[in-house]
From Swiss-Prot:
It comes from Homo sapiens (Human). One of its GO terms (cellular component) is eukaryotic 43S preinitiation complex. One of its GO terms (molecular function) is RNA binding. This is Eukaryotic translation initiation factor 1b. GO terms for biological process: regulation of translational initiation. The modification N-acetylserine is found at S2. Belongs to the SUI1 family. Keywords: Acetylation, Initiation factor, Phosphoprotein, Protein biosynthesis.
Length: 113
């Protein structure tokens, strides 16, 4: 007699990785740009999720030259190769990746304060 009406409802607590088929065509993964607090006012910006097609050391070299900061590529046990830059470079990295065409706007995820 009674039917369940919300079988098709969205579950906000469902595992986010199960919805990969809902992403627009041409998007592989997200690029996460995070900021981490160091001692005092010093910060680190980390970039994770850049495809293996790109040479991360060359990207770091371009970032260092354009943003006038130091940077390196580290191997993270969970996330793989991660780019670390000194200072708050979140906006600069977003603009650079969009200008060069490495990423689309909807693929960027900026985390932090």
């Amino acid at each position: 007699m009674s039917t369940i009406q919300n079988l098709q409802s969205f579950d906000p607590f469902a595992d986010a990785t199960k919805g990969d088929d809902l992403l627009p065509a041409g998007t592989e993964d997200y690029i996460h740009i995070r900021i981490q607090q160091r001692n005092g006012r010093k910060t680190l910006t980390t970039v994770q999720g850049i495809a293996d097609d790109y040479d991360k050391k060359k990207l770091v070299k371009a970032f260092k030259k354009k943003f006038a900061c130091n940077g390196t590529v580290i191997e993270h046990p969970e996330y793989g190769e991660v780019i670390q830059l000194q200072g708050d470079q979140r906006k600069n990295i977003c603009q650079f990746l969009l200008e060069v065409g490495i990423v689309k706007e909807e693929q960027l995820k900026v985390h932090g304060f």
